[in-house]
Amino acid sequence: MAAAAPATAAVRRMKLGSQGLEVSAQGLGCMGMSAFYGPPKPEPDMVALIHHAVAAGVTLLDTSDIYGPHTNELLLGKALQGGVRDKVELATKFGIAFEDGKRGVRGDPAYVRAACEGSLRRLGVDSIDLYYQHRVDKKVPIEVTIGELKKLVEEGKIKYIGLSEASASTIRRAHAVHPITAVQLEWSLWSRDVEEDIIPTCRELGIGIVAYSPLGRGFFSAGAKLVESLSDQDFRKHIPRFQQENLEKNAEIFERVNAMAARKGCTPSQLALAWVHHQGSDVCPIPGTTKIENLNQNIGALSVKLTPEEMAELESYASTDDVRGDRYPQAMANTTWQNSETPPLSSWKAQ
C-alpha cells in the first residue's frame, strides 16, 4: 500500500448551504467513538482526538442522540469544555428512538422539542449550530416537523436546520417551511444513487451537502481485510455489502482503487475521499475515525488532486453493476431516503 499523502494543506473553510453557516471543508464523524463500530473507545483518547482535529482545522463535529444512545453527545460535551465550543461547528441529530426495545422514528413536535432539550443538556451548550432530523418520520407531515424546528431556531436553541436520508420531494416540502441548510446523505465511490435526484435538488435550492461514510464505512481503507477485523459488536458485520457472497466481488473494487492510489502516491482511503471532495465546493464529507494517524491521513486527502480522467477512471471501478449488496441491512433500509415520503399536511391532526 502506498504511503499517505501528507496532511500539509490547511483545511479550507466553506459555506455550507446559503443561510450563513461556515464550516471546515472536511468534518469529523464521531459515531464510531461510542457506538455501532465495536466497543466504545477510551474516553481520554477520544477527547484528545477531537482536540487534535480542531487544532488541525477540522471544526465541523457530527454526532447524534442515538449514538450510544446519548454517550457520544456526552463525550462531545466533555471535549467542548475549556473554550473549545467557540472554535467548532456542532451538528447533532434527532429522530431515531428506541421504544419498548424497538427502533422507531419520531418527528412529532413534542418529541422534536424534548430531543433538542436533551441534546443541549448532554452537550452542555445553549445552542446547536446544525440540527438534523436523522431519519424522516413517515407518520408525520414533514411540514409539521420542520415547523417545530423553525420555532427552535426562533428561540435560539438551534441555528440551522438539516435533514438526513430525505428524498428530493421531502427536501422540497421541508425547505418551503424554513430554509434547509444541509442534507446529510451517504455518498462515496460505491454509494452514488443520490446523484440522480437528491444532489441536483439540493443545488437548485442552495442546500449544502454533507457526505457520511465517504470511505464506504472504512472499506476503502483496507478492503476485505477490514471485514475480517470487525468485532462481533460491529454493526458492519450485518451490512449486505460485507457478507461473504458479495465481498469477493466488492474486494476487486478495492484492489483497483488501491492500485491507482499507489500510482498517485497516496493511500486508497485518501483517493476515495479525494473523489468526494472533488464533487463540488458545496460538499463536505465527514469521515469518522478513532485514530489520530487516520485523521491526519483524511486531512491529507484534501491535497490529492484528481483530473477529470482520473475521476472517470475511479468511477468505472465501482459502477452500479460492480457493487454487490445493499448499503444497509433490510431492517434499517426501510428508513432511508427511498422510504421517506410523509403524509400531506392536510392529514395532520395535532395531538
From Swiss-Prot:
Belongs to the aldo/keto reductase family. NADP(+) binds at S213, P214, L215, G216, R217, G218, F219, F220, S221, A222, G223. GO terms for cellular component: cytoplasm. SUPFAM superfamilies: NAD(P)-linked oxidoreductase. This is Probable aldo-keto reductase 2. Residues 332-351 have a biased composition (Polar residues). It comes from Oryza sativa subsp. indica (Rice). The keyword Ribonucleoprotein does not apply. The active site is at Y67. Pfam families: Aldo_ket_red. Residues 317-351 are annotated as: Disordered. Coiled coil: none annotated. PANTHER family: AFLATOXIN B1 ALDEHYDE REDUCTASE (PTHR43625), ALDO-KETO REDUCTASE YAKC [NADP(+)] (PTHR43625:SF40). Substrate binds at H134. It is an enzyme of class 1 (oxidoreductase). Its EC number is 1.1.1.-. InterPro entries: Aldo-Keto_reductase, NADP_OxRdtase_dom, NADP_OxRdtase_dom_sf.
